[in-house]
Amino acid sequence: MLKKRGGNIVTKKVLIAADSSCDMPEEYIQKHGIKILPFNININNVNYLDRKEITTTQLFEKVEQTHQLPKTSAISPGTYLQFFEKYASEYDIVFIGLGSDFSSSVNSAILASKEFKNVYVVDSLNLSAGSGLLINKAVLLREQGLSALEICEELKNIIPRVRVQFVINTLKYLHMGGRCSGTSRIFGTALKIKPIIKVVDGKMVVAKKPMGYHRGLQALLHMLEEDKDNIDGDLMTITHCLADSDAVYLKEEISKMVDHKNILETNAGAVISTHCGPRCIGILYILKENK
């Protein structure tokens, strides 16, 4: 049996960490001292570290050049073990990972964490900035003086209130990756369907099937409007893959609809873009806690 490592869980500083699928801006990551573990992206049998060795623009340039769809591979237990060993002597660690239905990576993190007394792994049951919203909550809870264990428990209570919905411009990537139930029924249709994908209970599902991209954006706004009186004020994100002008449009429309002071535009990294394709865009937020 492996001996657990790590020190007292009460007196240490809290380190917040995540994988590269969280899609939070580098400026935010640096400001709050977040540690990021990169996924591997494979294109035409060449491996790249997400966020470090390949950008989203470069990803699709390589797809055009090679005519090969990219593949992602989970972060290994050994990589997590090395990371936790590096920081667990100085920090209590809260690690927030890509939802377990989308990758085995977070399960590898859980496996590695079992060797330590002071490493807490959170399965976000989400993706992209949906995980990023949880990172932001963890930062705020750390600022309030909560311990790593307390932060972990609070995040687990928040997870069911995270809302992630995005419009897909091309079904090719999502369908080939087999990541969303229901896409096979509409893939290849002559209609210009741009499905709205939601994350429900940790899984991606097709929520609506608008015809045309602009109608897809309107559907996103309509879904937001239904929640507008119950949105947590800490942070909302507009996350997209090479859809800058659409992000500007959505931010303008959202500002007319809700009085939210913290709307952050984020760019989808290579992990999310690999499965969702160019011009995918979403609105992500957390609902208020029912009192």
What are these regions (language model features)?
Residues 4, 9-13, 20-35, 40, ...:
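Mixed-charge interfacial surface used for oligomerization/domain docking
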Residues 47-115:
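Class I S-adenosyl-L-methionine
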Residues 14-74:
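N-terminal glycine-rich anion-binding loop in soluble enzyme alpha/beta folds
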